[in-house]
Amino acid sequence: MYYSSGNYEAFARPKKPEGVDNKSAYIVGSGLAALSAACYLVRDGQMQGGHVHILEKGELPGGACDGYKFENLGYVMRGGREMDNHFEVMWDLFRSIPSIETEGVSVLDEYYWLNKEDPNYSLCRATEKRGQDAHTDGKFSISDKGAMEIMKLFFTPNEDLQDKKITDFFDDEVLSSNFWLYWRTMFAFENWHSALEMKLYIQRYIHHIGGLPDFTALRFTKYNQYESMILPMVKYLESHGVQFHYGVQVCNVEFDCTDPARKLAKRIDVLRGGEKDAIDLTENDLVFITNGGCVENSSMGSQNKPAAYNTELREGGGWDMWRKIAAQDPDFGHPDKFCHDPEKTNWMSATVETLDGRIIPYIKSICKRDPFTGHVVTGGIVTVKDSSWLMSWTINRQPQFRDQPKDHCLVWVYSLFTDKPGDFVKKPMRDCTGKEICMEWLYHIGVPENEIEDMAANSANTVPVMMPYIDAFFMPRAYGDRPKVVPEGSVNFDFLGQFAETPRDTIFTTEYSMRTGMEAVYTLLNVDRGVPEVWGSVYDVRDLLNATVKLRDGKKATDMDLSFGEKMVLKKALSKIDGTDVEKLLKQYGVI
């Protein structure tokens, strides 16, 4: 497997890998990484669909990419996905996945057209004082000292960031800025999370720094991600004869690692309908393992019931399976680095369905758009700056579900601090019913206090979800804590998803999951085509200059708070580039 960039590799079709007709694949889980691996096995690996087996413990595919209407409960979206125009693997695959809405059109086509015709941008990024614009006004509000803290992290070698926290590099100069308000709420970072991952994020999205305050950097699907992404992939795979095995729980994968140069997956231990079973493997049976799980132990509440906070990892779950696998070889990772402290990895979301028109005027007042036009509404999350829960909420294009009533609006609410009492509902979010969470949200969007309870009870249906391990992948880590996608010496197995190690890309993204699937297939089948490299904006001087200026709210280098000696050094340096292309470039991007 090798990385590539450019159209030469992107538009090429690989030859059929040698011996692929004699191989089979067993994929543990049916999340985005697993489905991507299956798609690449079929499209580029040219494996017969009937030889590809997806083992899913539940009744539906999709993993964390969900979006369902549950009978007697309501609509539930545990999370949402923010996409980037340089998710290179994602677009490489979706150009080949047919739309399930429009014949002759790919998922990429419909996504591209939608975001061209209805580009994303926010008209209100944050509120305070019960629905008033917080007037962050597109500013990062970072001091020169704060900018230097970010720069220090940016240039620190990855090896020196192992097991380091964000607070090891940032103090209040950054953590009290608009930059951190935008960043932590957009990506769900906490102060105690991995400094290494923070650096990777800054480098990965350096080309989008200017688009973070108003979300012009982002693109979204038409519907929820289950309907817009998962279902088209499933239909594509089914059309090629791929075998979906629901109700099959993988408990362990057994390996022979006696020869470090030839590590073999020998058996998959499963439960089928509660009965123990096993799948014996040969070298021609490839195993794709989704290890860990950010939505494991998730629980749903209801309008009148809180979501349970279940932190005990059960036998037979994704973490338990990874622990059993990791015990067999040190190269298979260290799961407990990520799942040992749910107080540092949990947050909650809630899906609010409006049932009449009473709440809509308050939404319009903040986002300055009508949510029923079918176009962009909030354009990304609106963060309640003075919320004790650090609440954010968003409304994507409506409807979010194909069967959603036309006069109902779906709002996604999430909060990072589930253990703090609310500002109106004096309880921690984790102890609140859906109705109570809706009341807290209504309070923060400016609904009169004497109307809040009635509106939450009769004008909305709210379903809360607690996810104890949703931020597990952000915990401080060292190299080796996550297994490589294909570990050294592997003959017939690999790891997929957010807890597999691949260089330069960032976790908690659709792209990361899909990239691990592509890399796994290309490595095990020796597919003779390049995997698109992570977009290289961090190596583009234009993007670096632009980001430097935008991060400092347009402040030029010559306007920095410098000592007399520093000013003299800068003046002398600028004199050396007078009349050169370097000077033109610095002026073009506002550095001088």
Feature roles, as predicted:
Residues 203-286, 290-292, 304-305, 310-319:
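Helical element adjacent to the flavin cofactor pocket in flavoenzyme catalytic cores
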Residues 206-221, 284-286, 291-516, 522-539:
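C-terminal segments that line or cap access tunnels to active or ligand-binding sites in enzymes
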Residues 100-207, 218-220:
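Rossmann-like flavin
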Residues 13, 19-149:
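N-terminal glycine-rich phosphate/pyrophosphate-binding loop and immediately adjacent elements
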Residues 121-122, 483, 499-511, 523-592:
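Glycine- and aromatic-enriched mobile tails/lids
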